[in-house]
């Protein structure tokens, strides 16, 4: 999640 989450659909973050 792009709100600081782990690697998910948006691929942001760690």
From Swiss-Prot:
GO cellular component: a single term: extracellular region
Keywords from the UniProt entry: Allergen, Secreted
Subcellular location: Secreted
The UniProt record lists the keyword Secreted: yes
Name of the protein in its database record: Allergen Ani s 4
Organism: Anisakis simplex
Main location as per UniProt: secreted
């Amino acid at each position: 999640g792009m709100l600081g989450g782990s690697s998910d659909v948006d691929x942001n973050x760690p």
